[in-house]
């Protein structure tokens, strides 16, 4: 998986300022491209036929101290179908102020995904206030899996 979905919260990352120039040549080395619909539509040529994992949530930017407070649906399952996405990615903030809302978003995406046969990738977000510990990842991955994420 080539994931280039970080710009929607971080802005341009060094080396990825021009995704249309940087990402397209890398596509042949990846099975799946994970990005927002805007990045896919504007940067991936129609001749590229990789599977797509559509970033389906939006979050607060890095300018906000607690990024988990901005979580919501950025693209619904019908948008994923129009984009011919093979899966959707839902970010969850375990331990953050927006945990409950992000988990509800995950559950709703799982329900919609099951209706249309589209799997849901549960993404664990480690924000500024969260530690990247084994305990955190064990809890986060277990919660996302038990709530129905197809993969984490």
PLM feature segments, named:
Residues 1-47, 51-62, 66-152:
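Alpha/beta enzyme core
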